[in-house]
């Protein structure tokens, strides 16, 4: 392969095993806590959004689940871990705060989009008077949020831009 044909590494991506310039011991500590050492992010945060999706998926068959969905509250990454039983919650928050700002911004943009969608759907469901309307809102929101959860998971796991592009087009 010629020099012009070789792919260049993205300078905005943190090198494997390095979260904010951490060392091998820090990377091992992060891995043991289920935090990706390359990105400094943990998939546990996605459980917060998966819970909302699960409730939305139940609404068409069980309209009474709308009340459960309406009880879902947005939480930031730090708020989620602070409120969770995640063993390494302080480490998760610290790693997030030390993450590459470009990766964290990508991740935060996606989680912000999910939060906006779920909040808007929640507001619309509060106004809806018919179960059929709530079911339609739930189905639409699920279709919008699920790909974003997948995309966020790709960022957490250090997926490449090509992976992200593939997810967004399929």
For the regions a protein language model found, what residue spans apply to each?
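Acidic/polar low-complexity scaffolding segments in large eukaryotic proteins
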Residues: 166-170
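N-terminal acidic, proline/glycine-rich, low-complexity intrinsically disordered segments
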Residues: 1-16
């Amino acid at each position: 392969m010629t020099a012009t044909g070789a792919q260049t590494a993205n300078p905005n991506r943190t090198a494997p095993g390095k979260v904010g310039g951490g060392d091998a011991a820090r990377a091992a500590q992060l891995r043991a806590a289920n935090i990706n050492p390359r990105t400094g992010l943990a998939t546990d945060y996605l459980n917060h959004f998966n819970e909302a999706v699960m409730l939305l998926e139940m609404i068409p068959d069980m309209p009474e689940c709308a009340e459960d969905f309406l009880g879902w509250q947005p939480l930031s990454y730090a708020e989620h871990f602070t409120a969770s039983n995640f063993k390494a919650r302080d480490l998760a928050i610290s790693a997030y705060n030390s993450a590459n700002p470009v990766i964290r911004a990508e991740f935060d943009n996606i989680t912000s989009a999910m939060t906006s969608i779920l909040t808007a759907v929640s507001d619309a469901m509060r106004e809806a008077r018919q179960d059929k309307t709530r079911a339609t809102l739930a189905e639409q929101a699920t279709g919008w949020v699920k790909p974003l959860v997948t995309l966020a998971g790709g960022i957490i796991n250090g997926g490449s831009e090509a992976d992200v592009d593939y997810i967004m087009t399929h």
